[in-house]
């Protein structure tokens, strides 16, 4: 847990506060819409500010449409490398540059998606049902990843560093792993077999609408977890964090150091 949390903290430092912008590039208001040919991809890597991404999983050929200011568009690159669609500033603008587009709309689709990583203030909407054996969602900064439809996985991994949010009201998976560093939020609904969460800081998990067979969690700081649990809870708290649960799990293992608490709620 400690190694992963340290990694997450470093990730958000270098992607946000660690590189203090020395120039701000504002959108010129000359909005352009560009359709960019892309090859097959199953991973999205996004970097930038003010970007709104609308993604759809579909059987039609991969597509990418960009709508933004002309001067912003010219300073970004859009390409597929090793099945990864990368949308990010060109190399000379990746450090010490703050982008303020008038608008920055990305519309993308692919047959498969197994990884999504966003750095900055990107807002990603998954607008279709999403299916995958393994899926990884990563946020560094103040971005949002939101599933607007059913999401079904065997294994789901969520990593958030900073103040970002992950929202999925219809998530169905056998195993879920969430690592959180900072003051972020995970909102879940649906059904999960085994859920594991590690929180460093003031992160929050809102999952009363998600039925979990087992919950295992470690909280360092003032993090909070709300969940509906059927069979087992194993919780470790160091600090003032809390675990609130609904349900009647018969196996409850807890270790608390500090003022943290684990309690059942109606």
Q: Over which residues does each language-model region extend?
A:
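Intrinsically disordered, low-complexity terminal regions
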Residues: 1-266
């Amino acid at each position: 847990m400690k190694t992963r949390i340290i990694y997450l903290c470093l990730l958000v430092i270098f992607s946000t506060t660690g590189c203090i912008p020395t120039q701000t590039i504002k959108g010129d208001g000359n909005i352009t819409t560009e359709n960019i040919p892309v090859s097959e991809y199953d991973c999205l890597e996004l970097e930038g500010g003010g970007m709104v991404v609308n993604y759809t999983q579909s059987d039609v050929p991969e597509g990418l449409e960009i709508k933004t200011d002309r001067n912003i568009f010219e300073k970004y690159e859009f390409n597929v490398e090793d099945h990864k669609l990368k949308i990010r500033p060109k190399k000379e603008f990746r450090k010490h540059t703050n982008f303020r587009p008038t608008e920055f709309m990305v519309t993308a689709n692919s047959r498969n998606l197994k990884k999504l990583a966003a750095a900055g203030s990107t807002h990603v909407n998954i607008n279709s049902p999403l299916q995958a054996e393994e899926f990884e969602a990563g946020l560094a900064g103040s971005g949002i990843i939101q599933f607007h439809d059913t999401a079904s996985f065997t294994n789901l991994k969520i990593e958030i560093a900073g103040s970002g949010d992950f929202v999925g009201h219809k998530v169905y998976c056998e195993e879920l792993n969430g690592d959180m560093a900072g003051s972020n939020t995970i909102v879940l609904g649906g059904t999960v077999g085994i859920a594991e969460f590690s929180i460093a800081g003031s992160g929050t998990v809102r999952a009363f609408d998600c039925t979990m067979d087992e919950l295992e969690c470690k909280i360092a700081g003032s993090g909070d977890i709300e969940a509906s649990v059927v069979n087992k809870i194993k919780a470790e708290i160091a600090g003032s964090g809390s675990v609130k649960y609904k349900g009647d799990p018969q196996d409850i293992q807890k270790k608390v150091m500090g003022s943290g608490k684990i309690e059942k709620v109606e």
